[in-house]
Amino acid sequence: VLSSGDKANVKSVWSKVQGHLEDYGAETLDRMFTVFPQTKTYFSHFDVHHGSTQIRSHGKKVMLALGDAVNHIDDIATALSALSDKHAHILRVDPVNFKLLSHCLLVVVARHHPTLFTPDVHVSLDKFMGTVSTVLTSKYR
């Protein structure tokens, strides 16, 4: 459960991230594909090379969805309901991949905002991404 402090931390970080959605999203996907190459299997129809238009576009979509979750932080389940349906029933993404993506996003945020990425902020972002992952896998059951 996200505390009021966690929510404030997430919103504070997102205020810095939101101006870089395409760049950070693409970097997150690039990092995920490099560190966890098995995740590429869900993107066989994409050019998964660094800087590709498809990766930049999808990275931005991911970040926009996370922005929706931040903007509806008190009701993430409703904000991401359609996306949860899509990932569970159409794309059939293995739920473990959400954790891998979350880890890569935390690394990207820490790399670009090292002074902002305190241990408390790290915990808050990790909890937020865990909540997002739980919501996105909730319809798998």
Curated annotation (Swiss-Prot):
Red blood cells. Pfam families: Globin. The keyword Kinase does not apply. Residues 1-141 form the Globin domain. It comes from the Eukaryota. Heme b binds at residue 87. Keywords: Heme, Iron, Metal-binding, Oxygen transport, Transport. O2 binds at residue 58. The keyword Transport applies. GO terms for biological process: hydrogen peroxide catabolic process. One of its GO terms (cellular component) is blood microparticle. GO terms for molecular function: haptoglobin binding; heme binding; iron ion binding; organic acid binding; oxygen binding; oxygen carrier activity; peroxidase activity. SUPFAM superfamilies: Globin-like. Belongs to the globin family. Heterotetramer of two alpha chains and two beta chains. Involved in oxygen transport from the lung to the various peripheral tissues. This is Hemoglobin subunit alpha-A. It comes from Caretta caretta.
